[in-house]
Amino acid sequence: MSMVEENRPFAQQLSNVYFTILSLFCFKLFVKISLAILSHFYIVKGNRKEAARIAAEFYGVTQGRGSWADRSPLHEAASQGRLLALRTLLSQGYNVNAVTIDHVTPLHEACLGDHVACARTLLQAGANVNAITIDGVTPLFNACSQGSTSCTELLLEYGAKPQLESCLPSPTHEAASKGHHECLEILISWGVDVDQDIPHLGTPLYVACMSQQFHCVRKLLYAGADVQKGKYWDTPLHAAAQQSCTEIVNLLLEFGADINAKNTDLLRPVDVATSNSLVERLLLQHEATPSSLCQLCRLCIRNYIGRPRLHLIPQLQLPTLLQNFLQYR
């Protein structure tokens, strides 16, 4: 019999190994799904004791002790916005910071689904507001990705950090790329660095220009974002010209973008614009027309005031008309 086994082709033996692994995985998955459904059934029926027993035996959940789970009922309740089920599970001792294999917490799920009531319940139960997945994603990132202003505000109130390490996904960049200018405004009001530079993405302003998100570009510029900072040597004006977005090009020029700035290929914004396009004609016209003295004075005054103090312009002893002019209103 051993001789027969040895004479089998190697490929056939290998396929048998893979088939065995697949069978075990499917069996484990079936058991998990069955117990999750059973646990949910007991919760619905109000049998908390039985649901808690399943949780303790299957998920290893006990009060005050961490747990690892591929996908716990707490994750499901948070992702679907089922507040009553969420509270029931928490009262039965489910770990509020239970993580999946990718380190996703129930709070991540609640924010991704824009379920602010579930997010608040989890935070009140002690959820880690700055939990990070293996991809570097935080609950605040998920909230900004979905454009959830309520979750964004809630997380910041509970101590969420708008900026972690420089290479991790940034909520500011995510909001700017998706066009969620209201989330962006909330982040700015909490003091986020609007010029945060992530090497492979650039600044939020550059990302907004690449994504053609006019309202986000305007919000960032109003907040004092550096109009010249982009990605490496590419400026936001390079990005807007490349995307042929006339509105954004006009806005950047109004805020003092350098039309002669060169990227790593020694190309100016007009050089990366589509030939004979409206953007190319606009840039050539601006190049031949000097900025007005009023425009130059406004840029000079804003630079002198500095970004951290731009919000104090309304407190200056100046006529309202001049205050509005300095704030591009």
Curated annotation (Swiss-Prot):
GO process terms (BP): intracellular signal transduction; positive regulation of protein catabolic process; protein ubiquitination
Record-annotated SOCS box domain positions: 278-329
Descriptive protein name: Ankyrin repeat and SOCS box protein 5
Keywords, alphabetical: ANK repeat, Repeat, Ubl conjugation pathway
Comment, domains: The SOCS box domain mediates the interaction with the Elongin BC complex, an adapter module in different E3 ubiquitin-protein ligase complexes.
Pathway in which the depicted protein is active: Protein modification; protein ubiquitination
Positions of disulphide bridges: none
Gene3D superfamilies given in the database record: Ankyrin repeat-containing domain, SOCS box
Entry function: May be a substrate-recognition component of a SCF-like ECS (Elongin-Cullin-SOCS-box protein) E3 ubiquitin-protein ligase complex which mediates the ubiquitination and subsequent proteasomal degradation of target proteins. May play a role in the initiation of arteriogenesis.
ANK repeat extents: 69-98, 102-131, 135-164, 167-196, 200-229, 232-261
UniProt-listed Pfam families: Ank_2, SOCS_box
Family: Belongs to the ankyrin SOCS box (ASB) family.
